[in-house]
A protein has these predicted regions:
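Mobile, glycine-enriched helix-loop/loop "lid" segments at the mouths of ligand-binding/catalytic clefts
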Residues: 1-7
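Catalytic loop of the DD-peptidase/beta-lactamase superfamily, centered on the K-T-G motif
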Residues: 7-134
Length: 134
């Protein structure tokens, strides 16, 4: 959905939607089960298991340089280490948090994007982590 004049408007699949070339992975087309697998591979790699990539590569991607990662935002607080990533191209919003210490991940996908969506996703993420441990 797009957000126009205060209303969510469905975007038909026939719309020829183009992103700016500076968008590195914007609007990636992936099935949820495949994205879950992608995140699971990252979790396994962070915990030392070689799979699609070597474990050292995952560690570099997530923590390679102090206060920097490759495509992930790092959060260090209250004894926790999280890799997070969010994305939108204006018609959806996604958020993933990977708890690198506990080996858990939380993934939220929506089919709309506006401030209310972002706020709802943040609240849902907080509740998921409260209820399922992170």
């Amino acid at each position: 959905h797009s957000f126009e004049n205060g209303k969510l408007i469905p975007v038909p699949s026939t719309v020829d939607y183009h992103l700016d070339y500076t968008e590195p992975a914007g609007d990636i087309n992936i099935k949820l089960k495949d994205y879950i697998k992608f995140v699971q591979l990252n979790l396994q790699g962070i915990h030392g298991e070689n799979n699609y990539l070597k474990a050292d590569t995952y560690k570099f991607i997530h923590k390679g340089i102090e206060n920097y990662s490759m495509g992930w935002y790092n959060i260090y607080e209250n004894g926790k280490e999280l890799s997070t990533h969010s994305g939108t191209a204006g018609t959806y919003y996604s958020l993933v948090h990977i708890d690198r210490i506990r080996g858990k991940a939380f993934i939220i996908f929506t089919n709309s994007f506006n401030q209310e969506t972002q706020q709802a996703v943040r609240l849902l993420m907080r509740k998921l982590k409260e209820n399922y441990g992170s």
